[in-house]
Amino acid sequence: MSTDSQAPKALRGVGNFIDDRFHLAKTGEKNLRKVFPNHWSFMLGEIALYSFIILLITGVFLTLWFKPSMQEIVYDGPYERLNGVLMSEAYASTLHIDFGVRGGFLVRQIHHWAALIFVASLVVHMLRVFFTGAFRKPREINWLIGVGIFTLAMLEGLFGYSLPDDLPSGMGVRILQGVMLALPLVGTYVSMFLFGGEFPGEDIISRLYMLHILLLPGILLALIVAHFMILWHQKHTQYPGTGRTNKKVVGTPMFPGFAVKAGGFFFFVFAVTVGLSAFVQINPIHLFGPFTPTSITSGLQPDWYMGFMEGSLRIFPNWLDFQIFGYAVPIGVLVPGLVVPGLIFGGLGAWPFIERWITGDHRAHNVADRPRNAPVRTGVGVAGIVFYGLLWLAGSNDILSHTFSISLYWTTYFFRVAVIVGPIIGFVVAKRICLGLQRRDRETLEHGYESGTIQQLPSGEFIEVHKESSAETVHVLESKEEVDRIDAETISSVEAATDANGVEAPAARGLKGRLRAKLAHWYTKDNVSFEGVEAHTGHHLHHGAAEEKEPAQAH
């Protein structure tokens, strides 16, 4: 029997034809052997990618029947409860998708759920990158691309949410227009340009539709491709462990291991999305009715990722508004609607460079930090989460007041204080927890772990025997990088910032240098040092008992 496993002659001919022109054989072989680390948190980015693919597929389906027009018609369709109601063609076509197209309601639900999962997975993925320091050199550009993807994803979701022209989406567009009007000097012109006249105008749906299906998806697709190309070139970060270094990645090769896992995970994400869409209804526009400028309702909430902006608008005081030369400057809308999101996204994008400037760390990092080993960074991240979460809850202050029978004014006052105090408390608590975990790690590295075995010494004292940690655990604990702490005395002393001739160090000159020194001290002053700590080994297991036996024998 022949054991020849060569491909058929026709396929070999095609393969040789392509390889002779593009030389893909060696490149393909190398890429197929590329190693990906094995850890569940690295699949969070995969969820975002797969959700985006689902969005593209379902979005193409929906565009076949959706009509982006604000032309008013009298509805006469399959949803009988709204027959005879005046509505836009956009809303009527959405009702047709839900009730007139077979499977249309399910596809629209899948599209909406995929959008929510897409943004959620982006958030969790970015949190993983932030807390592990995976944004550091050489990945600053990829971090900026990720922030751009996150920002555009929120805008894309907002515009898509506004297309059906039902009551909640119309209210969202009205809030958007109010934020645009808050722009000093140019706000009115920007609003008129986008809406084609006074609100609601006749062009906003068609213009948002163009942005939603063409411009923003194209930019998102380009950024996602760039993100993965950079990731492929720079290699993946990995958590500390045996054999894992800045130059060596330990994991599963691209083919067949990772490819099979990724393919199966895509179908899992798709199945979960379809399951949610089939059994958990979301955004039932047929129950809300068409939007009219004179209509409003209570209890409605935007998609979760826009809740922080609504909360910011609700709790920000309006007594800060003022006028300049007769022009109103509505601080109560301008700051929560534009400044707060700008600070959030701007802070995210700038953080890698801020941290590098403070610490002076210009090294390349391919091994991720444990969050506990960067207590200030972790504290800042927790403070940001608390700030975002409180704003998100503030967007439901009316529902909270109604549910718990609390005055709306009191919930508003509470959130005004909480968004300032809460992040500070979150930072302090998270930092102290990280420092406590560092001390426990140092003790585990030096003395081993508690075995649960109690031993009595000759003196009558009882101790718990510690056992040697595994090699993997020791490697993880020893992966903590030593951070040089800057003493407060060093900063406050003029002599410490000068050389032997009394010349001030260039880095310490001026306000900028002194500010950096203060921040560096704050960033590193409490870090627990592992310097000089040796891993616990077997011959140290009973050192406490041995020390007690020697004086007993002397007697």
Predicted features, each with a name:
Residues 318-337:
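Short linear, low-complexity motifs centered on an aromatic residue
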